[in-house]
């Protein structure tokens, strides 16, 4: 093993010029006559200079002791200080890299990549040709590219049917009811001549990933969005789902959780449809024409998708927690995927069934505003009765046949190796697989954007550029079934990722409209604001506006539903997701209706309806409605490229720990205020429907409603006292973290000033130019010192800076890991993060303090105190880690 002192020698050893000068001095000393005064000078040098040097060395070692404890990582960064300007050509300052990343992305190139990806079916495990094509393109652009495979348990549709049955004639005296088919659903989407994707022979049938096979018949019950509280409303009204087929509308929560709760309540099958009432007023009822003639939803559009229980665990349901490689043991799946059949249908196919419910059971109006707020088929004769339909008169038959096999999927990885810090890694991911032949928005707009970013970095690499840190680009397979490719990869490389990964950047539905959006952990909020301020907006109302200027600035928490899940919730890696999206319609539904009433019935002033996971998510839709001219694809590539560049090339990691502490204070304050106010204001907001759809869905998706937080509901006075004390301790822990975070951010800001802001094109403080000015920065009197002394001090100063940078960077890098609890969340131990996780009954939306809030929702105050303690311990560990 190399001695640590020896390993440091290349960093502090004198350069060849200083060595030559010393050699000349030695030769001169050996040829000169001894003079008593020279001898005296030598004694003075020994008596004065040597102690000073030794003192400086001792002080330096003492100051570096905290960093020497982490010697491997700090030595790596120390090397950057002497190598940084030598390995980076002057023309490749970060300012020049930025110019390449802004100027290289092309509208036409993005369109070309999107056309390729959407030219044929590419279901998970059925897209090797696209994987190979992606690998080859990335390799052409300079990335070291390869394909990794996993063996996944997947289903594919074999057959399905749906029929509305009505009793024939008078069956009052019959021993067995005779049924006749009143309506048979088509279960297909119309072919549109001007949209070639819809007519492809390899078009994927409508089905649910991980749905169960079955042939079931039963009465129908309308369950609204199928949230936990929707089902609770039915239970309160004594409406049973036992033996029934649940009819739910898409929206609000993850589809698999709609099926999960129906299964728990005894339903034999589930039908899911997209109600146009959720299209923000861009509907036929409001005068908009359906696609392709207008921006409204096509009546036959069907949302495919997975019904895996995503909030329990993503990934292969037979190998939870470990990679699904050939030959590994496989377990039962009942905990992770449904045991009852389900199919997705269009609203055109749902109409006869909804009408068959008319007059049976209560109506949605009897259940409050949440049930009636977005009903879009009233003009078609639907009364939105709940049912059930009379079992002796009206039933539905649902037949679903799925074929399950274990089959390979293929991730593509493209790597730009770091030149100085190769073991610090930034991962950038987009999934490639789609439910349909198209997938223009989801996911292949993101695929096209990533290609443009890889191509842009390739342009820089061809001119000699190399990143400071390693960049790994990933094209995931199997995301649509349950985040399979990314989850299996994270599970396989978990130890390495926990050590090396700095951040994960996700782009899924990269472009679906003109509105920028982001979800991220608070560490990255500042960077998102910074990058969006550097990119021109395509939607400028004032010349010179940036993406940041035209964006609300709201950054949401990360839940689940895309490939960041394994990185953040399982591995504790700082993560961010970025996108341009549509509003689903015209923004606010009332605004869209008003525009239609005034005769403005085109897509010009409203956001066209994006028909998610349908055949109409096509290149033609993107070209005509989603992003005409592909201007937002180019802008998204610029944003993504700069995000990657800052993370991969900024010497001081561009994180802000103080933003995390501020967010945590907000989260704890919310719990405290809810305890104090008993949520009366929230209850009123729910009753009047003044919450946004997103907020309403989050609340309705929880196991209990607003009275959950009413401290008066704690019967045990001691339990109430203990819980309040636990929350107070939690707040104190956040305050301690905030103090340390503020100090770390201040130190990082100071270091950025010292090493130079490379993204502005300046050389860093390690450059060998302008040394006179640098000497003044180190010490005003250093400019008067001998040359050899200045060189020595500068070298020591650079080493000291190196250790400080390493110290700060490592604390930022590992902060997110401190929030992992190895025991995992209750009954879903795969999720380790104590701050963020998908809501157990929402799936998509991010839950804050999930273990704590779920305990409160369950009314288990003892467990709530336990979780408050776990979170407190993790926060204190994080605070200690920032010191």
Regions found by a protein language model. Give the residues of each.
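Extracellular/luminal Protease-associated
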Residues: 190-326, 330-334, 341, 442, ...
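N-terminal hydrophobic or amphipathic helices/low-complexity stretches enriched
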Residues: 44-54, 60-129, 136, 335-341, ...
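Alpha-helical metal-binding/catalytic segments enriched in His/Glu/Asp
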Residues: 412, 428, 432-483, 488, ...
């Amino acid at each position: 093993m190399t001695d640590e002192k020896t390993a440091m020698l290349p960093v502090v050893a004198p350069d060849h010029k200083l060595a030559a000068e010393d050699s000349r001095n030695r030769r001169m000393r050996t040829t000169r006559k001894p003079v008593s005064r020279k001898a005296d000078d030598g004694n003075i040098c020994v008596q004065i200079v040597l102690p000073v040097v030794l003192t400086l060395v001792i002080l330096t070692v003492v100051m570096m002791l905290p960093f020497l404890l982490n010697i491997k990582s700090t030595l790596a960064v120390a090397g950057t200080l002497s190598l940084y300007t030598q390995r980076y050509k002057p023309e490749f300052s970060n300012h020049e890299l930025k110019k390449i990343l802004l100027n290289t992305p092309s509208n036409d190139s993005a369109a070309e990549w999107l056309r390729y990806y959407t030219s044929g079916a590419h279901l998970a495990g059925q897209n090797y040709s696209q994987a190979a094509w992606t690998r080859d393109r990335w390799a052409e652009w300079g990335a070291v590219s390869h394909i990794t495979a996993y063996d996944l348990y997947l289903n594919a549709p074999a057959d399905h049917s749906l029929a509305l049955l009505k009793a024939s004639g008078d069956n009052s005296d019959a021993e067995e009811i005779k049924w006749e088919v009143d309506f048979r659903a088509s279960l297909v989407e119309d072919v549109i001549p001007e949209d070639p994707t819809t007519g492809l022979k390899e078009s994927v049938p409508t089905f649910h990933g991980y749905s169960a096979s079955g042939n079931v018949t039963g009465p129908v019950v309308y369950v609204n969005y199928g949230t936990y509280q929707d089902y609770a409303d039915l239970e309160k009204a004594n409406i049973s789902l036992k033996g029934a087929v649940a009819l739910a509308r898409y929206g609000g929560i993850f589809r698999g959780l709609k099926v999960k709760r129906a299964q728990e309540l005894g339903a034999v099958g589930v039908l899911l449809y997209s109600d146009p009432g959720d299209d923000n007023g861009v509907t036929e009822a409001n005068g908009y024409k359906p696609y392709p003639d207008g921006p409204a939803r096509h009546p036959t559009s069907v949302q495919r998708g997975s019904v895996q229980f995503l909030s329990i665990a993503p990934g292969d349901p037979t190998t939870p927690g470990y990679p699904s490689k050939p030959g590994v043991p496989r377990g039962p799946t009942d905990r992770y995927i449904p045991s009852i059949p389900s199919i997705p249908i269009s609203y055109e196919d749902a109409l006869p069934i909804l009408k068959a419910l008319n007059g049976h059971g209560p109506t949605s109006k009897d259940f409050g505003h949440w049930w009636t707020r977005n009903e879009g088929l009233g003009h078609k004769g639907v009364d939105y009765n709940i049912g059930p339909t009379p079992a002796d008169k009206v039933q539905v038959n649902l037949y679903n046949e799925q074929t399950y096999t274990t089959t390979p999927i293929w991730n593509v990885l493209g790597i730009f190796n770091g030149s100085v810090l190769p073991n610090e890694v930034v991962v950038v991911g987009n999934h490639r697989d789609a439910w349909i032949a198209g997938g223009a928005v989801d996911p292949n707009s993101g695929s096209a954007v990533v290609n443009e970013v890889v191509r842009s970095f390739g342009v820089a690499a061809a001119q000699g550029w190399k990143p400071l840190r390693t960049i790994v680009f990933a094209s995931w397979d199997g995301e649509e079934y349950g985040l399979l490719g990314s989850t299996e990869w994270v599970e396989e490389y978990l130890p390495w990722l926990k050590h090396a990964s700095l951040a994960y950047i996700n782009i899924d539905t990269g472009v679906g409209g003109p509105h920028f959006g982001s979800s991220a952990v608070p560490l990255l909020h500042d960077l998102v604001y910074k990058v969006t301020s550097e990119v021109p907006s395509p939607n400028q109302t004032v010349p010179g506006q940036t993406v940041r200027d035209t964006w609300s600035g709201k950054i949401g928490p990360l839940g689940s539903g895309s490939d960041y899940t394994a990185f953040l919730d399982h591995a504790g890696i700082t993560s961010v997701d970025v996108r341009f999206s549509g509003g689903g319609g015209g923004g606010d539904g009332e605004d869209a209706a008003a525009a239609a009433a005034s005769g403005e019935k085109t897509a010009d002033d409203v956001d066209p309806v994006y028909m998610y996971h349908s055949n109409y998510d096509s290149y033609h839709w993107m070209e005509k409605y989603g992003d005409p001219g592909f201007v937002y694809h180019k802008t998204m590539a610029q944003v993504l490229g700069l995000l990657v560049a800052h993370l991969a090339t900024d010497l001081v990691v561009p994180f802000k720990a103080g933003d995390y502490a501020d967010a945590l204070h907000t989260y704890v304050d919310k719990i405290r205020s809810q305890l104090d106010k008993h949520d009366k204001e929230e209850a009123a907001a729910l009753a009047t429907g003044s919450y946004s759809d997103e907020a309403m869905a989050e609340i309705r998706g929880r196991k209990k409603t607003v009275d959950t937080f009413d401290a008066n509901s704690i019967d045990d006075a001691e339990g109430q006292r203990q819980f309040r004390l636990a929350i107070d301790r939690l707040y104190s822990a956040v305050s301690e973290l905030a103090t340390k975070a503020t100090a770390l951010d201040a130190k990082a800001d100071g270091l950025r000033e010292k090493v130079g802001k490379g993204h502005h094109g300046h050389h860093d403080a390690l450059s060998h130019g302008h040394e006179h000015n640098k000497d003044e920065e180190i010490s005003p009197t250093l400019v008067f010192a001998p040359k050899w002394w200045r060189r020595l001090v500068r070298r020591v100063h650079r080493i000291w800076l190196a250790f400080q940078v390493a110290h700060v960077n490592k604390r930022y890098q590992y902060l997110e890991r401190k929030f992992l609890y190895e025991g995992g969340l209750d009954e879903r131990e795969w999720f380790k993060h104590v701050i963020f996780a998908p809501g157990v009954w929402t799936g998509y939306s991010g839950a804050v303090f999930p273990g704590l809030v779920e305990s409160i929702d369950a009314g288990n105050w003892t467990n709530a105190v336990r979780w408050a303690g776990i979170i407190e311990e993790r926060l204190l560990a994080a605070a200690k880690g920032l010191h």
